[in-house]
Regions:
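Substrate-binding pocket helix/loop in short-chain dehydrogenase/reductase
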Residues: 97-98, 105-110, 136, 218
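Active-site helix of classical SDR
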Residues: 121, 157, 165
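Short C-terminal tail/terminal secondary-structure segment
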Residues: 146, 237-238, 249-264
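Short, small/polar-rich loop/turn modules that mediate ligand/substrate recognition or access, typified
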Residues: 173, 178, 248-250
Length: 264
């Protein structure tokens, strides 16, 4: 299938590792020009070198900016003035009991996970509308619907992303611009791998056993019974970003391996 992404300019936030990196690589494989983002120039440069070595025919740009701040968003938008595709992937998470989550924590999570995407969408949307084509995608999570008791503040931001995406989509009906969220399931990112390895050492068991225990106890409804790979999420994102996905709009696209049990 031709996804029609040849020459499209895609901005992927938080793309120096994990799902963001996989999305950047996959969109480039489909012919898109990709803007990579991370907080430090050193990290961005390293990932650019890695991506260019992986795909010598692709065009990559890089912007170092902390998009969890308004100033960081301004840094990115001053360098990249337009985009055909915006993937709001930047996000943070931490395990913390509700009674231990401070006001500062709540505001920090909202700024990084929600407001980064709000600010960037507000900036790039007018250009998409003027061209009559564009894609805005928020990388949400199954935690948006299955609020994790161990990180309620994270779940709140993932639900907010779905609401923002739906609201923007309803504001641009019939324009050729689609706005969606993709709900990822538990994914084998660097952070997840570190967590699994740490738990394995603490328990004196293998990483595979920790993963098995995780899906037996923490995510028993998973139909996949393993961590998804970043590349599996990226493949879904690439399709949602494509010219073929015009009928997908305002939707929370579920790519969470069946963790969410509801069918509606």
């Amino acid at each position: 299938m031709n996804l029609g992404l040849q020459g499209k300019l895609a901005v992927v936030t938080g793309s120096t590792a994990g799902i963001g990196y996989a999305i950047a690589a996959t969109l480039a494989d489909e012919g898109a020009r990709v803007v990579v983002n991370g907080r430090t120039q050193e990290r961005v440069d390293a990932v650019l070198a890695k991506l260019r070595l992986r795909n010598r025919g692709a065009e990559f740009l890089g912007v170092a900016a902390d998009l969890g701040t308004a100033a960081g968003v301004e840094t990115l938008t001053s360098e990249i003035s337009n985009a055909d595709i915006l993937v709001n992937n930047l996000g943070i998470f931490e395990i913390k009991a509700f009674l231990e989550i401070t006001d500062t924590d709540w505001f920090r999570f909202f700024e990084v996970n929600v407001m980064s995407g709000v600010r960037l969408s507000r900036f790039y949307l007018p250009g998409m509308l003027s061209k009559g084509w564009g894609r805005i995608i928020f990388i949400s999570s199954e935690s948006a619907q299955n609020i994790p008791v161990e990180m309620v503040h994270y779940g709140m931001t993932k639900t907010a992303q779905i609401s923002v995406a739906r609201g923007i989509a309803q504001s641009v009906v019939g324009t050729g611009v689609t706005v969606n969220s993709v709900l990822a399931g538990p994914t084998a990112s660097e952070g997840a791998a570190s967590f699994v390895e740490s738990m394995a050492k603490q328990q004196g068991v293998s990483a595979a056993e920790v993963e098995k225990q995780f899906f037996a106890t923490a995510r028993p409804t998973s139909l996949l019974k393993r961590f998804e790979t970043p590349e599996e999420i990226a493949a879904v994102v690439a399709f949602v970003a494509s010219t073929q996905a015009v009928a997908i709009n305002g939707a929370p696209v579920r790519a969470e391996a069946g963790v969410v049990q509801s069918i509606l």
